[in-house]
Swiss-Prot record:
This is Ribosome-recycling factor, mitochondrial. GO terms for cellular component: mitochondrion. Belongs to the RRF family. Keywords: Mitochondrion, Protein biosynthesis, Transit peptide. InterPro entries: Ribosome_recyc_fac, Ribosome_recyc_fac_dom, RRF_sf. It is found in: Mitochondrion. SUPFAM superfamilies: Ribosome recycling factor, RRF. The lineage of its organism: Eukaryota, Fungi, Dikarya, Ascomycota, Saccharomycotina. GO terms for molecular function: ribosomal large subunit binding. Necessary for protein synthesis in mitochondria. Functions as a ribosome recycling factor in mitochondria. PANTHER family: MITOCHONDRIAL RIBOSOME RECYCLING FACTOR PSEUDO 1, RIBOSOME RECYCLING FACTOR. Disulfide bonds: none annotated. It comes from Debaryomyces hansenii (strain ATCC 36239 / CBS 767 / BCRC 21394 / JCM 1990 / NBRC 0083 / IGC 2968). Coiled coil: none annotated. GO terms for biological process: mitochondrial translation.
Length: 257
């Protein structure tokens, strides 16, 4: 019996040794939750901070931006001025020998007043203007329109064609040449310095670009970068002003020779 008791005690000892040992130190765990109100406040606080930072960045970027000038657009407009003046300069060189001399006349027809170009067209043949009348019923009306103008010309019906009027070209005199040159200079000044958008002068285009440029920056004094941009535009304006002057002088010499 003593042997059985010993075995029982040994088995109990082994069993006790195999049981897991639980530490006596306990760390309490607490579930942490953020209330909706606190979360909203934290989000709002962070949002305001980000918004402020973005605003500062945008202000810095605005300060660093250099006002821009559309050089392509300005160049195209300057070219348009040169082209329009060149056309008028060519007409001035022809003076009263230009076939367009009658184009602005108003003709009184049976259907009322109409423009010259709607009832006739003009060409130059030798030392004569040849006016072709579209409707024979308007021949007399066109003759009266020419006689009533300040052109000092006397159209005659061509015997070989009743719908054709022959008008001798006026002789070119020194006085008429000087007058043509004077009129051309007035046109030149209008295309160069004329005011008003309707005139489309180089000065008007420059003024529009300058005003738009100045509105893009709020500082009274231009920065170095801004100064460079505007100086480049001023060079472009001068370049086309010189071109306009060249066209004028060339046409003036052709008129006076």
């Amino acid at each position: 019996m003593l042997r059985l008791l010993t075995r029982s005690q040994a088995f109990r000892a082994v069993t006790l040794c195999q049981r897991p040992i639980i530490s006596s130190r306990c760390i309490p765990i607490r579930n942490f939750q953020i209330s909706p109100i606190l979360a909203k406040k934290n989000k709002a606080k962070g949002g305001n901070k980000n918004k402020s930072e973005v605003q500062e960045i945008e202000e810095d970027n605005t300060d660093n931006q250099v006002p821009e000038i559309d050089f392509d657009d300005a160049t195209n407009k300057f070219k348009g001025v040169i082209e329009r003046f060149s056309k008028q300069a060519n007409e001035a060189k022809l003076g009263k020998t230009s076939p367009n001399i009658f184009d602005k006349l108003i003709v009184e027809t049976a259907n009322g007043e109409v423009g010259f170009t709607s009832v006739a067209q003009t060409t130059v043949k030798g030392r004569n203007f040849m006016i072709t009348v579209f409707d024979p019923s308007n021949v007399k009306s066109i003759i009266n329109a020419v006689l009533g103008s300040d052109l000092n010309m006397n159209p005659q019906i061509d015997p070989s064609n009743k719908q054709t009027l022959k008008v001798p070209l006026p002789p070119l005199t020194t006085e008429s040449k000087k007058e043509n040159a004077k009129q051309l200079k007035l046109v030149y000044e209008r295309f160069k310095n004329g005011s008003g958008r309707a005139n489309g002068s180089l000065a008007t285009i420059r003024g529009d670009v300058k005003n738009k440029f100045q509105k893009q920056h709020k500082k009274k004094k231009l920065s170095d970068a801004e100064e460079k941009v505007f100086k480049d535009f001023e060079k472009l304006h001068k370049q086309y002003t010189d071109k306009l002057t060249e066209v004028f002088k060339s046409a003036e010499q052709a008129i006076l020779k």
